[in-house]
C-alpha cells in the first residue's frame, strides 16, 4: 500500500494545518454489524459470507472463559487488513467527496488544510462521520491540529524550505530512526562473519536497499543515499579482502 500517491509539495503548497486523527484501538473496535453490512454489498457467495461471519465472531478467552465477540478483528491474520480496508474505504470516499487532501495507511491517516479554521471545521465533521457512520471511537488526547514541522508520518517528516517571497513550502524528509534502521540492516548483511557467498550477499543487500528506497522514494533522500552508498561500498570491499 502506498503512503503517498503524489509528492506532498507538488500541488500541496500552502497546506500548513494538519488534522491528525488517532483511531482508538482500531482493530479491537471494528463494529461487526457495520463491517458485515459492507461485506454483504460486495460478496454474494453465501458460504464465503458465513465463513467470514464465523471467523469474526469466534469466541475469545478472557480470564479463562470463552466470550462471544461482537466487535474487533483478530490482529495478525491476513484477513484483518483486507476487512479493515473495506471499512475504511468509506472514509476514503467521504474525504474524496469533500475534495480534501489526505494520506491514509491502514488506520493511520491525516488531512491537510490551509488554515486552522478549516482544520477545526474538517476535524469536527470527520469526528462525527467516524462516530456516526463507522462507529469508530477517536482518541482525542492523541488527535489534534498539527503544523508540518511538528508532525511525523510513517517514518517521514516535514522541514520548512526558505525562499525569498515564498511561504508555506515544506520538504519531505526521512526521519533519523528510519535511516538508522536501514543502516543496521545493511551492516548485518555485510558483516564478514556472515557465511554468505558474494552473489548472495549482493542479492540480500539489493532486496533491503530497493525495498527501503521504494518506501521513501518521494522524500529528499538522494544526497544521503550517495553517502550511504560510499559507506556500503567500503564494507563490501572489506568483505572481499577478508575472504
Question: Which ranges hold each PLM region?
Answer:
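Conserved polymerase palm-domain catalytic core
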Residues: 2-150
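Hydrophobic packing residues in well-ordered alpha-helices of helical domains and bundles
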Residues: 102, 119, 123, 202-205, ...
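Conserved nucleotidyltransferase catalytic core and NTase-mimicking acidic/glycine-rich helix/loop elements
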Residues: 204, 217-243
Amino acid at each position: 500500500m502506498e503512503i503517498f500517491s503524489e509528492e506532498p509539495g507538488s500541488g500541496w503548497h500552502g497546506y500548513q494545518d494538519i488534522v491528525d486523527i488517532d483511531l482508538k484501538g482500531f482493530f479491537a473496535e471494528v463494529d461487526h454489524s457495520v463491517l458485515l453490512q459492507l461485506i454483504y454489498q460486495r460478496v454474494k457467495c453465501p458460504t464465503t459470507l458465513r465463513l467470514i461471519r464465523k471467523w469474526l465472531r469466534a469466541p475469545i478467552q478472557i480470564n479463562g472463559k470463552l466470550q462471544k465477540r461482537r466487535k474487533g478483528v483478530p490482529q495478525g491474520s491476513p484477513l484483518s487488513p483486507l476487512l479493515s480496508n473495506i471499512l475504511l474505504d468509506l472514509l476514503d470516499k467521504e474525504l474524496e467527496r469533500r475534495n480534501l487532501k489526505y494520506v491514509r495507511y491502514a488506520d493511520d491517516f491525516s488531512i491537510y488544510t490551509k488554515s486552522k479554521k478549516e482544520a477545526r471545521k474538517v476535524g469536527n465533521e470527520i469526528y462525527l462521520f467516524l462516530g456516526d457512520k463507522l462507529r469508530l471511537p477517536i482518541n482525542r488526547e492523541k488527535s489534534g491540529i498539527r503544523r508540518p514541522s511538528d508532525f511525523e508520518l510513517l517514518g517521514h517528516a516535514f522541514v520548512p524550505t526558505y525562499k525569498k517571497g515564498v511561504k508555506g513550502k515544506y520538504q519531505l524528509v526521512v526521519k533519523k530512526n528510519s535511516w538508522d534502521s536501514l543502516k543496521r540492516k545493511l551492516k548485518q548483511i555485510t558483516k564478514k562473519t556472515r557465511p554468505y557467498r558474494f552473489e548472495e550477499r549482493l542479492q540480500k543487500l539489493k532486496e533491503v536497499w530497493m525495498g527501503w528506497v521504494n518506501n521513501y522514494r518521494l522524500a529528499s533522500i538522494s544526497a544521503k543515499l550517495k553517502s550511504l552508498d560510499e559507506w556500503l561500498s567500503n564494507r563490501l570491499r572489506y568483505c572481499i579482502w577478508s575472504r
